[in-house]
Regions:
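Bacterial N-terminal signal peptides that target proteins for export
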Residues: 1-10
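Generic cytosolic/nucleocytoplasmic N-terminal low-complexity/intrinsically disordered segments
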Residues: 1-2, 19, 74
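Bacterial N-terminal signal peptides
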Residues: 9-18
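Sec/Tat signal peptide C-region and signal peptidase I cleavage site
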Residues: 19-25
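Contiguous segments within soluble domain cores/interaction surfaces
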Residues: 26-115, 119-125, 129-132
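Interdomain boundary/hinge segments at the C-termini of tandem beta-sandwich modules
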Residues: 137-139
Length: 139
């Protein structure tokens, strides 16, 4: 009887911890990438692309409360083992947005010219990281 009671308690504890981690993991903005955003939504979602233009997607459960933001690319330098600044693009969004895409426009080409590994950031107007993700660009 004691073994089954102990098993039941540990099972409930495991379920509670697992649910809590799942809820916490979904509370932050998530960044991901696609080839383009069109009428039917995201096209070609991946974390690996050939050189060229991409679209950066950010999705959140709550309003981002941002207006002037930037997307920054840092490229991994295999010689030093560190990421180094590569490019930065400025955008203006509405503070109530929960789902936003950043694509090529007249001021921001959003292009990856060189193959490699990149860390991509969404930065607020004080250059604080809102969210980030890694992407691989292949030839």
């Amino acid at each position: 009887m004691k073994k089954s009671h102990l098993f039941f308690v540990f099972t409930l504890l495991f379920i509670f911890i697992g649910m809590n981690l799942t809820v916490l993991a979904q509370n932050e903005p998530v960044m991901y990438f696609c080839e383009k955003y069109g009428r039917n939504g995201e096209e070609g979602v991946s974390d690996r692309f050939t050189t060229g233009y991409i679209t950066v997607m950010v999705k959140c459960d709550y309003a981002l409360n941002l207006d002037n933001v930037s997307i920054q690319y840092d490229k991994y330098n295999f010689r030093t083992g560190e990421f180094e600044y590569y490019k930065n693009f400025s955008f203006t969004i509405q503070p109530d947005m929960k789902y936003v895409y950043f694509a090529r426009n007249d001021e921001s080409d959003m292009e990856f010219e060189d193959p490699g590994f990149y860390r991509v950031f969404l930065l607020d107007d004080r250059d604080k990281t809102v969210t980030s993700s890694l992407i691989e660009i292949i030839p």
